[in-house]
Design a protein with these regions (language model features):
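Divalent metal-binding pocket/active-site signature
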Residues: 1-61
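H/E-rich (His + Asp/Glu) clusters that bind or coordinate divalent metals
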Residues: 31, 37-39, 46-194
């Protein structure tokens, strides 16, 4: 069994209010401790939540709580992070750079789009990706053209283009295919089909 759940703050759904406490990554410990594989949407890259490990229950960024779980050895084969919405203007900076630079996490990342969110031009900001150094101006112009024709393709190509402004690291090509580790497949066998 694999559980896909939203982590971090939720902004797309506001009907009736959203309890942001439900996006706390530390809530995943129970299913993880039971051996269930979990995909955390957006790598919990927005908002803050209570740190249950802190005696004073201080608020900590959801992203840092998620990374703590990702760095827990017993969860290495169970916890995965989805990179959907990682190019939105609210995640540019520490979350995106960290995920690009932490190559040790790449085999535990899965591609996702969070469709239809990337199709909203106001939050898909190539100017910010460019100004932070994730893409070149030429890539920015090309991505803008792609967005006008196909916003979903824009999201895919954008994730293939971005590089860390600090190290130049990119998402590995393997991230855009089947995650063999997630599905327990032999990555050396090209006949693995889900």
């Amino acid at each position: 069994m694999i559980i896909l759940c939203h982590l971090g703050e939720e902004h797309a759904m506001s009907a009736g209010g959203v309890d942001q406490k439900l996006g706390n990554p530390l809530h995943l410990r129970l299913p993880l401790d039971c051996g269930v594989k979990v995909i955390g949407a957006h790598c919990a890259s927005e908002g803050d939540n209570v740190d249950f490990d802190d005696k004073d229950l201080k608020k900590t960024s959801n992203f840092k709580l998620f990374l703590r779980l990702m760095d827990t050895p017993k969860y290495k084969d169970l916890l995965f992070g989805d990179i959907s919405s990682m190019l939105l203007y609210t995640r540019i900076g520490e979350p995106l750079t960290t995920i690009l630079d932490r190559e040790d996490l790449h085999e535990n990342l899965v591609f996702g789009s969070d469709y239809p969110v990337p199709c909203i031009g106001l939050i898909s900001r190539t100017d910010k990706l460019y100004s932070y150094g994730y893409i070149t101006n030429e890539e920015r112009l090309l991505l803008n053209e792609i967005f006008e024709c196909n916003p979903l393709l824009f999201d895919f190509v954008g994730k293939r283009c971005v590089k860390s402004p600090e190290t130049g690291n990119k998402f590995p090509k393997s991230l855009f295919g089947i995650n063999h580790k997630l599905f327990g497949l032999n990555s050396n066998n090209s006949n693995n089909v889900i």
